[in-house]
Amino acid sequence: YADGTYPVISMTDGVVEQMGWLPLGGWRVGIRSDNGIYYYYAHMDSYGEGIEAGARVEAGMELGRMGSTGYSDVEGTSGNFATHLHVGIYIPVEGQEDLSVNPYYLLRYLEGEKVTTAEYSFEELPASQ
């Protein structure tokens, strides 16, 4: 992409639960899936059209653009590291903090399938994968 950013694509259907600036994560968006799983995308450059707290999103929808924001208390700081996307997946556990799940295998699956927009949400991945 000419501007040096890449699209950030939602891995799930759900609702934008949180977004905005975090000192470490920079511009970020958090999606709560219909099954309660929380998907976290951080270090974003910008948000996509219509992405706001409470908005409904679908798997494959562009959430915004990948960037290098964060690692500063100064809102909007970027360039302290290379452009990348920090992805977190958190499964709710009754009576405890959400369980952090390594997104590696989901991302490998999507990469292996050459998926450019998510064809499956995390909850719908074939059992054989």
Question: What does each of the following model-derived ranges do?
Answer:
Residues 14-16, 54-69:
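A structural signal for short beta-strand/turn segments enriched in small hydrophobics and glycine
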Residues 80-129:
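Acidic, glycine-rich catalytic/binding loops that coordinate metals and/or anionic ligands
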Residues 3-5, 10-53, 74-83:
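Zn2+-dependent peptidoglycan hydrolase active-site motif and core
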Residues 41, 63, 86:
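Short alpha-helical segments in extracytoplasmic peptidoglycan/chitin-binding modules
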Residues 65-73, 89-93:
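Short regulatory "switch" loops immediately downstream of catalytic or recognition motifs
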